[in-house]
Amino acid sequence: MFGGLAAAVAIVFFVTAHEAGHFLAAKAVGMKATQFFFGFGPKIWSVQKGETEYGFKWLPLGGYVRIVGMSPMEEVSPADAGRTYREKKFWEKSFVLLAGVGTNFLLAFGIFYGVGVADGAPGGPTTEVGMVSEASAAAAAGLRPGDVIVAVGGSETPKWADVEAALQTAGPGPNAVRVDRDGELLTFDVNLTASETHAGAGFLGVTPTIGRVDIGPVEGVGYAGRLVWDGAVSTLEAIFRMVRPSSLAQYFGVFLGDTDVPGEIRPVSPIGVVSIGTQAESATFFFTILALVNVILATINLLPLFPLDGGHFAVAIYEKVTGRQADARRLLPIAAVVIGLFAFLGFVAIILDLTNPINL
């Protein structure tokens, strides 16, 4: 319960931090921002402070800052002359546009760095049992998570690779498995089943815990940077999988009640992130998920698709290179398609997270 609440608060904070990046950057270069909202759709609550309205809207799928002159179709009041987005220099526009994603990338980097230095990096599998599969040979014999496998069939197993080798040698059938349980050596008679992936090997039905490797403060910089990069690449790969025609066809099926969507193409809404947060069994896993949320937010917004931040940045580059203002008549259809696509994926994600929650 606490994990879910913490995840919900964190999502609001990360989206707000993203928009605050835009907002503060706009203020720094003299642009006028009239709205700062979390969410989209009908307004829940707002308050006017100075020239900016702050508030919340019903659909928790992001947020926005409205900067005068940023919309190509907006009519600008003469009173705002000199404070509009379109009047500013290229570097000022770029600073404002990239401040949001920069904030999220920095948050992700900071979280990854903190987790890495405090708890280390994932190492290789250990001989400690992390999970026991239901209806497996290990479960029937009485093995538990936390048991350390010392030997299988008379062969000592100081490493997980030794456990796998011993199971390969033992094959299906009765065998003795010795474990260390809280300092006490116990021997279990286990009736190993046949492995479905390794011919001739015995199958115990346990997964190992993953060890941790210590990381120093200096090493943590490179470690966190690699995780941010890997997360961004994985996000792009996931997006490309989601927009394939076969994937989109499956998403349409969700509206007809078919919620059996494969994990590799399943979109996740903030509701799903909160659900994952409630299932987090360690602080390391919980904070890693929060870091990835920031990477995903930043990477999606960097896509060169109008009206995302990356799309606005692409337009700013075009105008800088050509010396001409972008044609609003061409930008608006692109914006309509992009908004429609993300709204569609967002609704699919919400339906899936409500009707077929993610179970870790």
Residue spans for each PLM region:
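Small-residue-rich helix-interface/hinge motifs
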Residues: F2-A79, V293, I300-T322
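Internal alpha-helical transmembrane segments
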Residues: A28, T52, L59-M131, P333
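Functional transmembrane alpha-helices
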Residues: R83-T84, K88, E196-L297, A314-P333, ...
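Pore domain of cation channels
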Residues: F95-L106, I289-L302
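Hydrophobic membrane-targeting alpha-helices
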Residues: G110-A118, A298, L302, G346-D353
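PDZ-domain C-terminal substructure recognizer with occasional recognition of PDZ-binding tails
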Residues: G114, R144, V150-A151, E164-T207
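Conserved PDZ fold ligand-binding element
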Residues: A138-W160, V228
